[in-house]
Amino acid sequence: RYPFACIYGIGNALLIKNLAKHYKHLFVFESEIELFILALSTIDLSEELKVYKVVLFDCVAKDLEIQIAMIFDQQSILEYLSLYEMFISSHYYLKYYETSILSLNELCIKSASVAIRNADITCFLPLLTHGQFLQNIPSMLESIPFQRILNERKNKFENAIVVSAGPSLAKQLSLLKAYQDKAVIFCADGALSMLEKEGIVPDYVTNLDFTDLAMKFFQNKENLKQSIIALECATHPNIVRSLNAENCMIVLRNKALYQRFNLNDFGYIDTGTHVSHFSYTLALALGFKNIIMIGQDLAFDEEGNSHSKGFDFGEKFSGEENIDKLKVPAYAGKGEVLTHITWNDYRIKLEYLFACNDQKAKFYNATEGGARINFTEELSFKECCEKLLTKEKPKFELPKSLTKNRSDKLLVKFKEKIQKDQENAKRFLDDALALKQILENILSKDFLLPLEFLEKVYQNLENFNHSLDEDEFIQDEVLRGAFAYRGKMIADVLKLHIQDKTHFITAYIKAYHEWLLYFMEKLEQKYKSLSKV
């Protein structure tokens, strides 16, 4: 009944071949690449590998953590991560690879925790940002289209500096000022005031805040008339309204939720979940080959500061104090530094981003402090400037927005799509309500119902699941956390290992009913957001 299993050791691959018949996915980990080769030369797994029924992992690969994170983030796996367990294929592996197995198991548990945490089963943030995205559409259609920026500026210069607001930033500002004409500067909104005090004008300022606290960063927006202010499409509407100017660009994320509206002029980019991630992906989209990062500490400094001197909310920002802490390797391998789980999640996401784009650009970590970030070259900011920044950067005019006629037509099409989504949401709510009433009728009985009847009910639940899983509106990721919760509820039943089918289906129905109530509540919230458009 488990949808996947993790196994350490390929052995002679016969066990893997036989198990593959019973699982949707088998994840096989091996520390000796020669054993992979030997096993695959004995047993043909080509068909299983081709359709990802069997996935092989090299335990000594540098990017193993990233590979695991990618798999665990897949919706079909994410839902059932609470079932994770590392099985060992034979006593041989336990005898000779126990240390490797324990280390791998710890890594998998950590990756599963990050994936589950990111899924956000409360759906609070996805529902909030979905509503804000809908409110921002009219402003976005009047802003600079992202595709015009790409058409006019892509591959025109090689060197970029991404500025973050970590504690190490202050010591880099004098050098940044000296070289500001020789690099295109991407500035996280939180670092803006520090640059302003030094007379440094960034080329791009990025923002993706779901609250309006960031309005404080833009108090001197008149200094940014030649800068592009890049806002993520779901940033707080108050920020969008306060910055609604000819140099604003509101960008759509490269997610199904935003792509399904076909507003292609304004997308698409992986803005990530923190502002500097947005800066890096914007620099990559514009074709920069050398991306230098400063102020990217992702850790507290020795005085316990979370941000650089001059940060608008103080060097010890209260928002960072109550998050669970941990120690991680420090920049340049100099011991360890204190961070918290949110920064650490950001670091893992950045490492994934850098590893995936190492053929497009070279990433230089010139922070000279904070946490070590893998898949970057650690080099002092001075060395980066002297080595790379030898040419003046080009000057550009601000691109124009769309004509009013074109933006009005796009708005009409957008509203038509929203109308269809409303109808779809209402249909699913009605179906869910009918199903809820059936399940409550079954659960109200004080005796076990016949197995044949229960099997029909179980099949109806599977059919409803299938309709949910195949619908583009339902699967636009706003309710991703709700489906992670569905998986957890079902996994809790599977972990009971109920052998009797009647008792198993009854337990399944009880769990599904509890989830269905939760799902209806979240879908109702999404429906209300659509109704406000």
Give the role of each language-model region.
Residues R1-A160, P167-A183, S193-M194, L213-F217, ...:
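N-terminal donor/sugar-recognition subdomains of glycan-related enzymes
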Residues C6-G9, A160-S164, I185-C187, T206, ...:
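Structural motif
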Residues E30-S31, L192, G199-D209, A283-G310:
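Glycine-rich phosphate/pyrophosphate-binding loops
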Residues L40-S41, S174, K197-I200, N207, ...:
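Short acidic, glycine/serine/threonine-rich loops at helix termini
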Residues L169-V184, A188-N247, V251-R253, Y268-I269, ...:
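Glycine-rich phosphate/ribose-binding loops and adjacent secondary-structure elements
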Residues P237-L298:
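Active-site/ligand-binding-proximal alpha/beta "capping" segment
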